[in-house]
From Swiss-Prot:
Binding residue positions for Zn(2+): C249, C316, C323, C326
Note accompanying the cofactor annotation: Binds 1 Zn(2+) ion per subunit.
Subunit structure: In cyanobacteria the RNAP catalytic core is composed of 2 alpha, 1 beta, 1 beta', 1 gamma and 1 omega subunit. When a sigma factor is associated with the core the holoenzyme is formed, which can initiate transcription.
Assigned keywords, A-Z: DNA-directed RNA polymerase, Metal-binding, Nucleotidyltransferase, Transcription, Transferase, Zinc
Gene3D superfamilies listed in its UniProt record: 1.10.132.30, 1.10.150.390, 1.10.1790.20, 2.40.50.100, RNA polymerase Rpb1, domain 3 (1.10.274.100)
Reaction catalyzed: RNA(n) + a ribonucleoside 5'-triphosphate = RNA(n+1) + diphosphate
Organism: Synechococcus sp. (strain CC9311)
Name of protein: DNA-directed RNA polymerase subunit beta'
The keyword Transferase is annotated on this UniProt entry: yes
Gene (name only): rpoC2
HAMAP family, per the entry: RNApol_bact_RpoC2 (MF_01324)
Length: 1365
């Protein structure tokens, strides 16, 4: 019952609150007298953001919401009045566009020209073109901006893009500038940009080029939403149980945050300092555990603090949660986070939500970025001086410009030609110089590009083909110096050693057919239509010619080399429903079934026909036995049966076998029963013979039913039964079998069990006589002195071998007599044609003819393809003509198309002449010179080089003749070849237009596999092992680099601190990222490539392990990796312009790195290979050190978010995520308990979640009052009342009736009240505080179980408060 003092206390409180409210109101009135700050400037998106943030910080939520509302109204009002909309006329194309494009065109024409003259390579041309267009595009954007700013600053499009309301510059550029370069489906950039914009409209070609990218964008967006949603789900699952559960974990560990360019930006805001922070002069700026707000962050910057230690979720030591001090501010209200805040879920959502904004990937940029290096120009005319410190080496830029690269830092001076101060330029290592020492230069000349620090970019090797543009003869410049390179497989390739030109000198190149031989001599003159080369096709064996109809562009000539007609046999064909059947009939009437049909081809040892013979056909299946003397040839496969070696007698014991696959319930007879023919043994299956049945079954499924015919005799004679046990024995006629049992014929005796008793079954034996050789008429064969032979032989084949059991109901054929083809030539392509021919005497009778044909395909004259010259083919034979072996069947001539001089390369043994060249009059040019020529014979000249004083050449080629006032040149085309390129052609080779000349090998910046956006985030958070990861240094030391022979591989040796030597072999195609003599640390990259995070953690741990205790080494290694992961994830988001606070990523990374793997359990109860929390192992090992046991050894592990989710302590959470069955079965087998600590488990079970208002931080006070469980409320009409627990975790809520007397809600009931309630329920006083189930206490000790009073339970059940259970 409440008493009066508590009433008075309440009224005093109310008065106090009213006073405070009045004071606050007065203060706000006073504040409003100071004039609001007045700002006069353009407000764009950025300023709006700052304005709303300022309002939120200083005036709270309600005021900000109201202000935002007013801003919106203001915006709409003026947008309406100003009529901001987009019309076609707002899209204004800058006038400067035409000039910019013309300049670009001019540059590109120059580039193409230098490529044509062989000054730059194909790769350099491509790079230059792409860079030119990229630069033009950038200059055009500037022109667009300038145009809008100067001429129409209030243009709707410009205002939208500029203020950040909608759209960005790249979109405006496409509307009014140019669309620019597009990528093709392979991701390479097409070097033809789209010059028009959307205002001018695209041509069909441009539209098609851009449609690829547009479709890709749409598909990416669709995929992205799904991917991003799944990422969020995994993140939520891994972090859902991270809840702020304590105020301060008291850890002394922390992370360091460094200033970037002297500024911290937002990176410190909302964190707590881990140590005192001192300024440069030693004054204390902040104590430990100070909250850092923006003003304090600015003070740090002002005081010159470059790095400081802050508390972070990564180092928090709170058990299975994060404490308030380590987490810092909740970013929703910029105050220290509350207890019970579900920070894990907030972190997951913060990282997952921007996923949709991340691109899936962008494409290759192809061009080489020129942004990192600053271009320096000369300010006046003067002379260049390098100075004594300079060290330079020749270098060719990616655009093909010959420059010099500096190897050291030095100063370059330009001394003016007149008076004045010299210009000094600081040159850094790696910079490019475009001038020479002592060179005189004009003003505004590019002197150098300064490299921005020693940046080692990762590059990859790429290749590009050089394709020949004209037919002719290849000639190298001597500078190329080709060398032979043999690779590991023994293939020989030719490589260029130096930069140089490869020339192709013009001419008409003819390809010769494989067997053609030239009929003109090298250097001889040829006239039009003269035969240059001739090829002939000859017969190999000779024979009768058959000309076939022409097919397409070729004609088949068949030569019958051998033929054989079976004269003793008639060929008879009959039609059946299954198709045509052909038989051979001999004079004595025996018939053979033909296995092939006329018109088909057969090979050696194939069966032509088979004797139709029923003498060896049985009635049923049975057992085969060979009598002594019968022999067969061993065969590899029994498919065609076994050939008889020697004739003899074959014994056959018939038995009928039914192979069945049916249920045993369908069986209609019993095992061992005697049945008559026609008995139904299984439903719908009848026996053909009488005999004894045996049944084979397996798992109540019938397999076989065997019926053995014969005569059955009951027998009790033990000796006889033993003799005939098992497989049975063959007994000759008249031989005694048992007492009173004998047989006149040969029988096969077996002992059998029947329902009547044991007895002997005498089975009949059939005898078949097998002749030694097949009795056949003469078949004959044809032999030729030099052609292939042909013959037919008869063979007998037995279908089964000795003791083989034939399972069958129908009869089988035991012996087959077959006619086989025998060609004594065993070449696989030798086939025989089977033909039906009429008999020479009786035309109605058909005979079988076997023919061996030689087939020659003769090309008909087609409208000749130009490379073959004009070909002319003639047949030299007629149909039916007989020719001898080696006679020519057809000849092909290659005719000259235009008069000229024929040349051909030298024929070698391994390579005959396959091409020849005719140098035509138009391939040379004679130029008259005004003065004496300055060139010599054999010299190669390109456009613009002087032939005579003041007379430049207007074509490229090789000088062939020089006279007093003229020069004759053979036209040609130079191709620049870069060093290390693969040469496909040799000096002097002849090439056709479109042939590959060389493969240029060049290095380009790696762009293809920068996995951007989502896939990269996923790769990091799932801790994926990359396919080709970089090689990491295991221990710190000094690097030594050794080159392997032939540049095949490099070895990087690291001499470690204890003088141990670690060797890292590096394969071809990998770029070494360290230099000789460099100091490296553990985990540093030795080669380029993606890093394997697992390997990195291992490197850190192994290195620290040798110097520090196990626990410290693990913590430090994990800390290094955590820092790396957070930075990497942040980099991806920053590159896409998304800002996420570090602490969210830290919460996730903390979950990924919280586990260690036990290697050796020591004396602990842990198991080797178990994944367990680091803190748990730490506690276990501390306990071991007290008791003196051996501690557990472990290694830290990194788990991807999916793995971490499946490895949580809660099996309910893991099962609801993935692999439900596996997780639940394992949990059941291991007998796991789930302590329901996280949110997900509780949601699934349907309890209050332990976050926010359900957070159990106030548990202790409740426990003190009411024991360990939430309370059950009585249904007392006076209101809600506490009652001691009946069952844990169940709350019975009953609505209260309007209060009759003013009892304070949830105050403790008085003794009298309790007594009344008890008496109403009939509960005895002692029984009221029983606990039906007790929950394990906080320290996991079970409270003792108390016994229920049966009477009380019964009473409660009657009232329906306890169920029967």
């Amino acid at each position: 019952m409440t008493s009066t003092p508590s009433k008075s206390r309440k009224s005093a409180k109310a008065a106090k609150a009213a006073k405070a409210e009045a004071a606050a109101f007065a203060k706000s009135r006073a504040l409003s007298k100071t004039p609001p700050p007045f700002r006069n400037r353009v407000v764009d998106k950025k300023v709006l953001k700052e304005l709303v943030a300022w309002a939120f910080k200083n005036h709270g939520t309600a005021a900000t919401a109201s202000m935002a509302d007013q801003l919106k109204d203001l915006g709409f009002k003026y947008a309406t009045q100003a009529a901001v909309s987009i019309s076609v006329n707002d899209l204004k194309v800058p006038a400067a566009k035409k000039d910019l494009l013309d300049q670009a065109e001019e540059l590109i024409t120059e580039t193409e020209e230098s490529y044509r003259l062989g000054v730059i390579t194909e790769v350099e041309r491509h790079t230059k073109v792409i860079d030119t267009w990229t630069e033009t595009n950038e200059r055009l954007v500037d022109a667009v901006k300038k145009n809008f700013n100067d001429n129409d600053p209030l243009n709707s499009v410009w205002m939208m893009a500029n203020s950040g309301a909608r759209g960005n510059m790249s979109q405006v550029r496409q509307l009014v500038g140019m669309r620019g370069l597009m990528a093709n489906p392979q991701g390479e950039i097409i070097d033809l940009p789209i010059r028009t914009n959307f205002r001018e409209g695209l041509t069909v070609t441009e539209y098609v080029i851009s449609s690829y990218g547009a479709r890709k964008g749409l598909v990416d967006t669709a995929l992205r939403t799904a991917d991003s949603g799944y990422l969020t789900r995994r993140l939520v699952d891994v972090a859902q149980d991270v809840i702020v559960r304590e105020d301060d974990c008291g850890t002394m560990r922390s992370i360091m945050v460094k200033a970037e360019d002297g500024r911290f930006g937002n990176r410190l805001v909302g964190r707590l300092t881990a140590d005192q922070v001192l300024g440069a002069d030693g004054e204390v700026i902040a104590e430990r555990n100070s909250e850092i707000d923006p003003p304090l962050s600015k003070r740090f910057e002002a005081a010159g603090v470059s790095a400081l230690m802050v508390r972070s979720p990564l180092t928090c030591e709170a058990n299975r949660s994060v404490c308030r001090k380590c987490y810092g501010w909740a970013l929703a209200h910029n105050q220290l986070v509350d207890l019970g805040e579900a920070v894990g879920i907030i972190a997951a959502q913060s990282i997952g939500e921007p996923g949709t904004q991340l691109t899936m990937r962008t494409f290759h940029t192809g061009g080489v970025s020129t942004a990192e290096s600053g271009v320096v120009r000369s300010k006046f005319e003067g002379t260049v001086e390098f100075g004594s410190k300079a060290k330079v080496r020749p270098y060719r830029t990616p655009h093909g410009v010959n420059a010099q690269q500096s190897d050291v830092d030095f100063s370059l001076t330009i001394k003016p030609s007149g008076s004045g101060k010299p210009q000094k330029i600081e040159i850094t290592n790696g910079s490019l110089l475009f001038v020479d020492d002592g060179q005189k230069i004009a003003s505004d000349v590019t002197v150098a590009t300064i490299a921005a620090g020693a940046v080692q970019k990762s590059v990859e090797k790429a290749t590009k083909d050089v394709i020949c543009d004209l037919a002719g003869q290849v000639s190298y410049d001597p500078t190329i110096q080709p060398r032979e390179v043999t690779d590991r497989q023994g293939n020989i390739t030719h490589k260029a050693q130096r930069l140089g030109r490869m020339w192709v000198l013009a001419g008409d190149v003819y390809n010769l057919p494989p067997n053609a031989r030239p009929v003109v001599s090298s250097g001889g003159s040829v006239i039009e239509s003269q035969v240059l080369a001739e090829a002939s096709q000859a017969s190999e064996y000779g024979g009768a010619i058959r000309l076939r109809e022409a097919l397409g562009d070729s004609r088949e000539v068949q030569i019958v080399t051998t033929s054989m007609t079976l004269r003793d046999f008639k060929l008879l064909g009959e039609s059946t429903h299954a198709g045509e059947i052909w038989n051979l009939e001999a004079k004595d009437g025996t018939r053979y079934r033909l296995n092939t049909i006329p018109g088909s081809k057969i090979g050696n040892a194939e069966v032509i026909a088979e004797l139709a013979d029923d003498r060896f056909r049985t009635q049923t299946g049975g057992l085969v036995k060979f009598a002594p003397g019968l022999a067969i040839k061993k065969a590899r496969s029994a498919k065609n049966g076994y050939e008889v070696n020697k004739g003899g007698t074959l014994l056959w014991i018939p038995q009928e076998t039914h192979e069945i696959n049916k249920d045993i319930s369908l069986l209609m007879i019993t095992d061992g029963q005697w049945i008559e023919a026609g008995t139904e043994v299984v439903k719908d299956i009848f026996s053909q013979t009488a005999g004894i049945v045996s049944v084979t079954q397996k798992n109540d499924i019938l397999r076989e039913i065997i019926v053995r015919s014969g005569s059955f005799h009951l027998c009790t004679e033990k000796k006889a039964l033993e003799r005939f046990q098992g497989d049975g024995v063959m007994v000759n006629p008249g031989e005694a079998i048992a007492k009173g049992i004998s047989s006149d014929a040969m029988v096969f005796v077996q002992a059998v069990e029947t329902p009547e008793g044991t007895g002997l079954l005498l089975r009949p034996v059939e005898e078949y006589t097998i002749p030694n050789e097949a009795q056949l008429p003469d078949l004959g064969h044809v032999k030729q002195p030099n052609g292939p032979h042909l013959g037919i032989k008869a063979t007998q084949r037995l279908a089964f071998k000795d003791n083989e059991l034939v399972k069958s109901v129908e009869g089988v054929e035991l012996l087959r007599t077959q006619l086989m083809l025998e060609t004594f030539d065993t070449t696989p392509q030798m086939t025989v044609d089977v033909e039906a021919v009429p008999d020479k005497r009786a035309k109605t009778i058909e005979r079988l003819q076997l023919v061996i044909l030689e087939s020659i395909l003769v090309r008909r004259d087609t409208i000749s393809d130009s490379s073959h010259g004009s070909t002319h083919t003639e047949l030299q034979v007629e149909d039916g003509q007989s020719i001898k072996a080696g006679d020519v069947v057809a000849t092909t001539q290659i005719l000259c198309k235009q008069a000229g001089v024929a040349e051909m390369p030298e024929a070698t043994e391994d390579e005959p002449v396959r091409r020849l060249i005719v140098e035509r009059p138009e391939d040379t040019i004679t130029i008259n010179t005004s003065g004496a020529p300055v060139v010599t014979v054999g010299q190669r000249v390109v456009d613009g080089e002087e032939l005579a004083q003041g007379q430049p050449s207007d074509c490229c080629g090789e000088v062939e003749q020089v006279s007093a006032n003229s020069v004759t040149m053979r036209l040609g085309r130079p191709y620049m070849i870069s060093p290390d390129s693969l040469l496909h052609v040799r000096d002097g080779d002849l090439v056709q237009r479109g042939d590959g000349l060389a493969l240029l090998v060049f290095e380009r910046q790696k762009t293809g596999d920068i996995v951007q956006g989502l896939p990269r985030i996923e790769e990091l958070l799932e801790a994926r092992r990359p396919r080709e990861s970089s090689i990491l240094c295991k221990k710190p030391g000094t690097v030594e680099i050794k080159q392997g022979e032939d540049d095949e591989f490099t070895t990087v040796t690291v001499i470690e601190s204890d003088d141990a030597i670690a060797e890292y072999p590096i394969l071809l195609g990998r770029n070494v990222m360290v230099s000789d003599g460099q100091q490296v640390n553990a985990g540093e990259l030795l080669t380029d490539g993606p890093i394997n995070p697992h390997e990195l953690l291992e490197c850190f741990f192994e290195d620290l392990r040798s110097r520090k205790p196990l626990m410290d080494a693990a913590q430090e290694a994990i800390a290094k990796l955590q820092h790396r992961l957070v930075t990497e994830v942040q980099n991806v988001y920053k590159s896409q312009g998304v800002s996420i606070h570090d602490k969210h990523i830290e919460v996730i990374v903390r979950q990924m790195t919280s586990k260690v793997r036990i290697e050796d359990a020591g004396d602990t109860t842990l198991l080797p290979g178990e994944l367990i929390e680091l803190r748990q192992v730490e506690n276990t090992n501390q306990a071991m050190s007290i008791t003196g046991g051996a501690p557990a050894e472990f290694t830290p592990v990194l788990l991807g978010i999916t793995k971490a989710s499946l490895n949580t302590d809660s099996f309910i959470s893991a099962a609801s995520f993935q692999e439900t069955t596996r997780v639940l079965t394992e949990a059941a087998i291991e007998g796991k308990s789930d302590w329901l600590r996280g949110l997900k488990e509780n949601v699934i079970i349907g309890r209050l979640i332990p976050a926010g208002t359900g957070f159990s931080g106030f548990e202790e006070e409740l426990r003190a009052e009411a024991g360990p469980h939430p309370d059950i409320l009585s249904e007392d009409p006076a209101g809600y009342r506490r009652m001691q627990n009946l069952r844990p975790d169940y709350t019975v809520d009953m609505p209260a009736a309007p209060a009759a007397k003013s009892t304070a809600l949830l105050d403790d009931p008085s003794a009298a009240d309790l007594e009344a309630t008890r008496s109403r329920h009939g509960i005895e006083a002692e029984a009221s505080n029983f606990a039906a189930f007790t929950r394990p206490d906080a320290d996991n000790e079970l409270a003792e179980e108390q016994v229920l009073d049966p009477a009380a339970v019964e009473n409660l059940q009657e009232q329906g408060l306890l169920s029967d259970e």
